[in-house]
A protein has these predicted regions:
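Mid-to-C-terminal alpha-helical segments outside catalytic/metal-binding sites
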Residues: 1-8, 12-29, 33, 215, ...
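Intrinsically disordered, low-complexity Ser/Thr- and acidic-rich flexible linkers and loops
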Residues: 42-57, 283, 287-288, 294-296
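Active-site gating/metal-coordination segments in enzymes
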Residues: 46-141, 148, 191, 195, ...
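Active-site environment of divalent metal-dependent phosphoester hydrolases
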Residues: 11-13, 37-40, 83-86, 108-111, ...
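Hydrophobic faces of well-ordered beta-strands that scaffold small-molecule active sites
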Residues: 3-8, 30-32, 75-78, 101-105, ...
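Active-site phosphate/pyrophosphate- and oxyanion-stabilizing loops and adjacent acidic/basic residues
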Residues: 19, 64-65, 92, 147, ...
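Short, acidic/polar
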Residues: 12-22, 84-95, 174-175
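Catalytic pocket-lining loop regions of alpha/beta-barrel enzymes
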Residues: 114-226, 274-296
């Protein structure tokens, strides 16, 4: 099976270690979202630099380097602030990279929240549409506000991040009702991500996720659902292998459902064809002078 993980912060563990885990558990490709953590202002996420006016511009040098070195295994997305004063020019620069597959916006902070609710993300979404880039949107507790944008930009592919769940909800108490309501829009897709962290109270294989997975599948259909482990952030609840095999062994999903959600949807929506030749498993303990074998769980 051609498996694509549609978001990993691989810069946290390094490209070599990421590849070793991918090889070990059978993942062909990863969409990298470079992330280090929050800045002093927790609504701003690093790596980024501050622009005049206090807006942060995210960057992803390690993500792009991984994609350049291993184009069959990695591509990347870039976070973009809707408040960036040079938004149009910045998106044009980003879109020139052959390995950029999507933009992502994270609606944190009072200014971003107010702008999102008031239609202030039009310029960002217009730029994404102009360059043919899908738009990943993280907007916890504000998912219904995405609906007007989906109507206004019917030819832009939106992807709801992290199941649309509220980050601060007690574990296993977050709901996806607002998210599945947006399945009425044919240009809105869902990333099934962080589900063990936000939606489950049980240990692996997280059987309490199955009714919610079925709810999402019935609403969106398999052609508009993609899987994401977000491994480096969610590993307190599930190892990378557990996040994957929860899906591979799900009794709710048919074999065709799994093929779409675990790879084909991402390939289609991100315009990222599968490589002609699948990866070959590399040794788990490569011999590197003075180097130790990578460790992972």
């Amino acid at each position: 099976m051609d498996i694509v993980d549609s978001q990993v912060h691989s810069n946290v563990i390094g490209t070599d270690t990421t590849l070793a885990i991918m090889d070990a558990i059978g993942i062909q490709s990863v969409l990298v979202d470079e992330y280090l953590g929050p800045a002093e202002n927790p609504s701003q996420l690093l790596p980024a630099y501050e622009l005049p006016g206090g807006v942060f511009r995210p960057i992803g040098p390690n993500a792009e380097a991984a994609a350049l070195a291993h184009p069959d295994r990695f591509a990347f997305l870039m976070r973009v602030s809707a408040l960036d004063p040079r938004l149009d020019g910045w998106v044009e620069v980003l879109a020139a990279s052959p390995h950029l597959k999507a933009l992502r916006t994270v609606v944190f902070g009072d200014r971003e929240v107010a702008a999102f609710k008031e239609g202030g993300f039009d310029r960002l979404f217009a730029a994404a549409r102009r360059h043919g880039l899908p738009m990943f949107v993280t907007c916890p507790r504000m998912v219904p506000h995405l609906g007007p944008y989906a109507r206004k930009f019917p030819d832009l592919q939106f992807v709801i991040d992290h199941c649309g769940a509220a980050f601060e909800a007690p574990r296993g108490r977050a709901l996806i009702d607002d998210t599945v309501a947006l399945a009425e829009y044919s240009n809105v897709a869902l990333k099934w991500a962080h589900a063990p962290s936000f939606l489950s109270n049980q240990p692996y294989p997280f059987p309490d996720l199955e009714p919610l997975l079925a709810q999402a599948l019935n609403a969106f259909g398999r052609e508009l659902m993609m899987w994401e482990s977000d491994y480096t952030v969610s590993r307190h609840r599930a190892s990378w292998a557990e996040a994957l095999f929860t899906m591979r062994h799900s009794p709710v999903l048919s074999a065709d459902d799994k093929a779409w959600i675990l790879g084909r949807t991402a390939r289609n929506l991100l315009n990222w064809p599968a490589p002609e030749k699948p990866f070959s498993r590399r040794p788990l303990h490569p011999h590197r002078p003075g180097g130790a074998a990578p460790k992972f769980d």
